[in-house]
Amino acid sequence: MPTKFILYFTPDFEAYAIKEVEGALGSARKLADFGGGTALIETDRERKDLLFLLSKARLILAKHISPIDVEFGVCGQGDKDLISILDHVLSVSYVLKGDRFSIQCRRRGTGSDYTSKDVEVFVGSWFEGNGSIPVFSSTGVVSGPEIKVVGIYLFNNVCYVGFSESGELINEHNDEYRLYAKAGKVSRSQFKLIEALRKFKITMHGGRVLDLGAAPGGWSNVLLGLGMEVTAVDPAALDPVVAASPNLVHLASISEIPPDGKFDLIVDDMNIDAESSAMMLVGLSRLLGNGSNAIITLKLKKGSNPFKAVNSAIHILWQSYDVVSVASLFHNRLEVTLLLAKKG
């Protein structure tokens, strides 16, 4: 029996994202384009096989998959729709007292007197009131027991609901804006690093980090908030609050990095082409201890073949690094993010 799901992707890479999902499942047909980098997809695979196959595939451009267990009509009136949505959620979900859970609602279209946040609060309050434990990004959870995930998608007058567990999903939790909130906002790009740390399950508490392409300082700000000593490299100025930190050293160029410097982590968000960024990171691998990690954002060009660009950069990185993971994060636009480990 065919199975439907919602696919999330960068709009410019829609065709490539659907193609890689088709490769993982054997079939994938677009039934509707919801806009904003989301589409309704149908596959010949059974529901029980869908998430297992996708979670095992090394997907690059698919940001998130939300399974659909039930779909039904809504009228746009909160006093009627919220109760109906909760009833349908309860019909397909399995969240017990003491279970950790996350409610994720997105909507496209107009004509409703309630928001996606209203839906999350209404449904989540019911589960919390019955003894289940809500999980928000502000808790900084990156490991532990599985999270029961309820996905709700509203498109005009139709609501789609799906239930899954976090280990089955490409991206288990989407509320990154509140993760590490204590760091404060310097630039939107810092949410990209926050999401990467969660996605790759990296916990850093102290240590030395090299931040390449640091200005205006969003990534450095997050890393400082984790208690790290940051060497920020960028010819441009940093945000005054970040620059004033006693745990930060600002260098104008890579040539100023001490040749005998050692770091526990390198992060690279430089706005240069993917191959150049990869070559830069290979040249700096001597600054990392064996097994230490690097996080790099590969910039892709609009209208180009993203698979070709990513594979070319990975071929260069293999000289010095093992590629642990490749992901298109929610906060990636024309780019993908890689987790690397220094060889040796």
Could you tell me what each predicted segment is?
Residues M1-G344:
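SAM-dependent transferase fold signal centered on methyltransferase-like domains
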